[in-house]
Regions:
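Glycoside hydrolase catalytic-domain context in secreted enzymes
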Residues: 1-317
Length: 317
């Protein structure tokens, strides 16, 4: 007898759903933290979703370091961006394999690379503008799509999972990002801030999207019905992750909720699958308060497990 989640004839979604349904609601909720515990009965080790690969595998030992993103963009060379992505994910996979042999599942050892940064660099005062490909939505789209394709590869499994960030309209000033409300016209959204994300989803099949800290037209990015609706419209079928501790900002700095369970519920119901931070520790409290359903938790868990299955983490080879 083979468990359904082990059946490679099934789609990644079907396998993820089958695995999720072997878990209790409490266990499903635990998988939504960025530092997810092991699922021992399935042979799935613990996993830390947080890894960086903007211009090289970051913070995890020796790796090739390419020029910063803004400098790579200055070459106007999309084929080069593909090759850069290929090198980064090959090294990330090698580091992951090496760490896994020793049971090391710490931060910066995983296959979910939170890159590229495809925000539009409009204001030179933004201290992280060098992480972007500049001010041009078209150039950002072309370079970003090729970087994602290089990262993810074209094999049966993803070599690594790229992540389009920060969705959306995130471009400083850095000191205001936790309470800032970006007021943007529909025209500017469609012409400036969304094209690169749309291209990475539709053309690049990017596996991850990260929500930003700021609000957009009053809605927090990690719980924005408008932004999540765009992802559904484009056919996104990966995982959505919050920027780190962004959901906590809902009740601490944006002041749009009163409590951590309310913030967790707002993000989860909108479609945020994985929480970088600790607010999703309050998911079960939100369930007890009637703010979310068990199905909300199950849906997010399936999305998270689907990505890990696409990375080959459930299969011996």
């Amino acid at each position: 007898f083979m468990e359904r989640y082990k059946d490679k004839q099934l789609s990644a979604y079907e396998r993820a759903a089958a695995l999720a349904d072997t878990l209790s609601t409490e266990e499903q909720a635990q998988q939504l933290k960025y530092d997810a515990p092991a699922i021992e009965k399935a042979g799935l080790p613990s996993y830390n979703w947080w890894n960086e690969g903007l211009h090289g595998v970051a913070r995890a030992g020796t790796a090739t370091v390419f020029p910063q993103a803004i400098a790579l963009a200055a070459a106007f060379d999309k084929d080069m961006m593909y090759r850069v992505g290929e090198v980064i994910s090959t090294e990330a996979r090698a580091m992951y394999n090496s760490a896994a042999k020793h049971g090391d599942t710490d931060i910066y050892k995983g296959l979910t690379l939170w890159a590229p940064n495809i925000n539009i660099f409009r204001d030179p005062r933004w201290g992280r503008g060098h992480e972007t490909y500049g001010e041009d939505p078209y150039l950002t789209s072309r370079l970003g799509v090729n970087f994602v394709k290089g990262i993810q590869g074209e094999e049966e499994y993803l070599r690594a999972a790229a992540c389009a960030k920060h969705f959306a309209v995130h471009s400083g000033p850095e000191s205001l990002r936790h309470e800032f409300d970006a007021r943007v016209s529909e025209k500017d959204m469609e012409e400036t801030y969304l094209p690169a994300f749309k291209a990475l989803v539709k053309e690049g099949r990017v596996e991850g999207v990260m929500g930003a800290y700021n609000r957009v037209n009053g809605e927090p990015s990690c719980a924005s019905e408008k932004l999540m609706g765009k992802l559904r419209e484009w056919g996104f079928d990966g995982y959505f992750v919050s920027d780190c501790w962004a959901i906590r900002d809902f009740h601490t700095t944006h002041k749009i909720t009163d409590t951590a369970p309310q913030s967790a519920a707002m993000a989860l119901k909108a479609g945020c699958d994985v929480n970088c931070g600790n607010t999703y520790l309050h998911i079960l409290a939100a369930l007890e308060e009637g703010l979310i359903t068990k199905q909300d938790i199950r849906t997010a868990c399936i999305h998270a497990l689907r990505t890990r299955i696409r990375l080959g983490q459930l299969d011996d080879n």
